[in-house]
């Protein structure tokens, strides 16, 4: 029987059926607070347990009695319930209740199966503590992204009864029961995109309708799924176990592949007779017709069942920690689930985005992590300290958290990532320091044996947006990290109390508070205070390993539904514990910590920490070769066989493929958390994380490629910076999400090679590709916006302003432009510099670029900005800049733009600053002098530093003078030394020139130095130089460089030196005047010689004959000598000039034929017009004959 009930725009559809194999319990009256009551013909009702609720709310440890959970008794009838729910914008959930820390019965907006009745809806301890990480964010505007959920059902013959899952994803499409029973129309303008779903074997669409508005719908949906999922009794039948592939013969007669769950039959997912293609002609969304329903329909999400959050091991009693879920049949030993681990648990295949198919395999164990204290059996499933009660539930937990957080964080830069951000906290993160040793895995490993479930799930360590945090944080947080050391040392001894001091924040998640929250003024919260004690214990364990402090993202605040910032950790469900930051550069670790890490690895008797020796204490976290563990039964002493974060195998044999980017299509093993076994992570953690390494993956499966397909051997950065960088500059970039095709350029097995891999144009280059949103697309004000396919254009402008460090950010104040140094744009520049270059901050001040001085100094426009500001800056501003550049002064000195900043300090800086920079130059004078840009700094320094420092600087060149003189850069330094330094200090240069004057004078650079010596050195220093010059005057005047030295002597030399040179020229005026270089010397001789010497030279030209013509005629036609004649006309005495004129007049007509003769005629006309002298007609007869 099918009934449709519509209450307040909420359409609820259910169907009662009979499941004879389940126990019957009396029905209880419905809770009037529930909007819709769904009753089943059968069903096991949980007994009321208010005490458990209140115990949890008080933060105490309690253990509900068997039967209070209603796990095994979960009615199969609820499997056939499909909900179509639509909440209006701004509509809030039901009022608060008294139990479960705010979780009351009226909170569930949909019928929740058997436990919808008030008496039976006792939220179990694990549900309250771990309702899917951040599900308490429903008060926020979660955006138009659904978070579909589903649950695992038993694998028995009852699967033929009909659909068994509760699928919330396809809210706007075809009814799961057919249009005849209940039809919900598809909203207008919702684009259908086949092949976008994340299912391996089904052609399902994943359309997120804009009508899904921003009321937190997805959160409550998943919350419902979590609250009504079956317990361990169902899972004991093997949620991942084998099934009969023919059991779905009623499912349209269409047999699906087993998918990647290898025989995991989760129940028929379509009702018999249901037509796959409805009015919209598309398959029912969210895989209603697929067997494998344990993954999300939206990118980046996956379903998890409620029992995945069981806190303690099956054999652990409630007194050792928080209350655990106990099935009605008793705890099931771990061995019952060993068969589950033999299959891989891949995530839903993503759409093609230009890489080879990278499978998202997670198995049912914790993900390997890197830690120096890896000797503790953290994930020993044979011990009492299990983190989760059931391995298969743990697998689902990993699928959920790892896919949503680690993958989403890794992928988020691309606008074509279809990630559902609803489960994440977007901006409300306060960056602070966790004290030394509080790395969740360092401290957790050390304290695991006594803290029980204190171990932080792996999503804590998710590779948080790679490099989106200022590198300076590592230094800035050192003080805070050290400050917490004393208190932690005092708390390391009471080990017996650790089991009772495990406190979870407000029942939000399984992850304990970390000490960084103690530094944020939150001790007023009793839960926080208790967590402080617990975290201090773990902190003390980390101290033993010598681990330094780690910067973490502390979700110390969140935005409520009104957009107000609420800073109160623990008061809100779902605000996850701090996320450890991964440095944009190699991880900074002290030498003592490095030694301690090596020692810890060496001290491991069973080799548990063997994989840490090469990974923890160095800047690299290399990828090892994957070695799958074939045996299904783990060994207690080998749980941490490879604890590397990018380790070369899983923590134990239960986890054969716990990889974020596993190799191959559906390979169950040979993967690690980091990336595929054949993928290179790059040289260092910081430099390569952005691009997923130099090679993303060498997958074994082929995929369609495109012009920029990111194959295993391709360059990740082939696209120009003007286009949206493929993954690459998620390289330090922030995270932002959109549901455009596929995550991080990964091709999906379910999509053909022809699937579009082009990112949407709306978020290219500078859009949301640079924003940091741990929770998805926000509009810059903490509000979610739609991440549905096609919604990018709607929020194009909003997403572009959602950068963590942008002025419109909700995390940092816009009064100080707090950009992270690692928030690198596709151009490679920081966001601040990029905005400055684009004139977005025309009134930027020096103080506003604090922390970016080095970057600005090395940029063309940034360097110019600093130079201009330094000229008019106050001493305090200059000191601000100086403090940042001093340590890296040498780097700037040799930089093409940075050297100008250093020069400005020599020019405008204080004496102390000049001396400090001069001290940085000491010892590097020669290298800087020979460097293109460093030589400029040396020259500027020589101009402005005191003489004592000048002398010290110059002395470093002693012995290298000739090398510098002949160098294109060094010669400028030597010239500046000669110009600025006292000549007495330069005698070593004069001595070095002895015997080398001719060679240096004919050298392109040496000739300049010779001239500087002649200008500035003392007479007794220049005499030996001049003597050598006079010996080679004839050769020098004809040399392309030597002629400049002779001209310099004629211009600036003593009269006796000039006379010596003129004497060398006399008798050779005609010949030398026709020489390209010597003609310049003759000109200088005519100009600078004495009157007598000048008359002699002019007379020589007038009286000498060159064959049939006079020498003057020859010179007037010559391309070089004509300039000598012109100079003679200019400088000759009046009487001698008249003689020259008369000598030229007979050749006037002929000179008109020659290019250079015309210069002479022009000179004559100018002269005669000026003086009014009439020499007759200048123009001769037409035939040219006189």
Curated annotation (Swiss-Prot):
Residues 22-73, 233-272, 485-524, 613-648, 742-775 are annotated as: Disordered. Residues 1079-1083, 1080-1083 are annotated as: Guanine-nucleotide binding in RNA target. Residues 899-903, 1043-1047, 1122-1126 are annotated as: Uracil-nucleotide binding in RNA target. The modification Phosphoserine is found at residues 19, 75, 98, 106, 124, 159, 197, 209, 229, 305, 709, 714, 806, 822. Phosphorylation at Ser-714 promotes RNA-binding activity. Following growth factor stimulation phosphorylated at Ser-714, promoting binding to the 3'-UTR of CDKN1B/p27 mRNA. The modification Phosphothreonine is found at residues 112, 514. Residues 828-1168 form the PUM-HD domain. Pumilio repeats lie at residues 848-883, 884-919, 920-955, 956-991, 992-1027, 1028-1063, 1064-1099, 1103-1142. The modification Omega-N-methylarginine is found at residue 796. InterPro entries: ARM-like (IPR011989), ARM-type_fold (IPR016024), PUM-HD (IPR033133), Pumilio_RNA-bd (IPR033712), Pumilio_RNA-bd_rpt (IPR001313). One of its GO terms (molecular function) is mRNA 3'-UTR binding. Residues 863-867, 935-939, 1007-1011 are annotated as: Adenine-nucleotide binding in RNA target. SMART domains: Pumilio (SM00025). GO terms for cellular component: cytoplasm; cytosol; P-body. It comes from the Eukaryota. Residues 511-524 have a biased composition (Polar residues). It holds the Pfam family PUF. The modification N-acetylserine is found at residue 2. Keywords: Acetylation, Cytoplasm, Differentiation, Methylation, Phosphoprotein, Repeat, RNA-binding, Spermatogenesis, Translation regulation. Residues 971-975 are annotated as: Non-specific-nucleotide binding in RNA target. The keyword Acetylation applies. Recruits the CCR4-POP2-NOT deadenylase leading to translational inhibition and mRNA degradation. Interacts with TRIM71 (via NHL repeats) in an RNA-dependent manner. Sequence-specific RNA-binding protein that acts as a post-transcriptional repressor by binding the 3'-UTR of mRNA targets. Binds to an RNA consensus sequence, the Pumilio Response Element (PRE), 5'-UGUANAUA-3', that is related to the Nanos Response Element (NRE). Mediates post-transcriptional repression of transcripts via different mechanisms: acts via direct recruitment of the CCR4-POP2-NOT deadenylase leading to translational inhibition and mRNA degradation. Also mediates deadenylation-independent repression by promoting accessibility of miRNAs. PANTHER family: PUMILIO HOMOLOG 1, RNA BINDING PROTEIN PUMILIO-RELATED. This is Pumilio homolog 1. The gene is PUM1.
